[in-house]
Amino acid sequence: LEDFERHGQKLPLIVLLDNGSTEEDIVALMQAKIYDIEIVVLDHHFPGELITKTLKSGETIDGSTECNNEDIIAGTVAVDEYVDTHVNPYLVGGDSQITAGALATEVAHIINPDVEDLVKHLPAIAVLGDRAEADEVEQYVKLASEKGYDREQLKKIAECIDFEAYFLRFMNGRGIIDTILGVDNLDKHPKMVEALYKEYLKRVDTQMKAALPNIKRVKLENGIYFNVLDVE
């Protein structure tokens, strides 16, 4: 904002990935819009009930009106008042199983078709990392197999991404993340994944040994076991 006021530079385009669809995001989005900053949201979390629904017939109806999800081609939710572009499967009758990582890759491919081969395995990493369950998951895994990745390798990469993200927090780790994902430094990719995965397993084992003795297990009436861990 200071550069805009002092030097007339363009305001940034904010792209929110895996975040931004819910009513909890409205205050932050509203603040950005007050400064006339353009905002794009790519998210797969439940955005709240639809305010309006546009159907295949072209008719727009109230969000509370019952209809088949398959008939919805566009919907609006509360945050749409504060964003310029909102991509979320729920807006077209879908659900959270098409994850933000998969959505972002699809959008990237639409913007620049030349990256298709470079990124075609990324949606599979995203959906497996988020433990999604949908027909599209198998389609993405099949696409990734064309680059030589099997399901276990993809899961391993997803675990490594989560592990590294924990340590990076809000730091810029683009170089190492690109290496883990296999979109850059391809000669380093296998070694990086193996090294991080071994360390990840060690940390998980340590945490499990510390946590399991302190878990209280309760069997519910329906036969499901409910495990409680006091982390205080």
Question: What function would you assign to each model-found segment?
Answer:
Residues 93-96, 169, 185:
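Generic alpha-helical structural element
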Residues 10, 171, 175-232:
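Gly/His-enriched, cation/cofactor- and phosphate-binding structural elements
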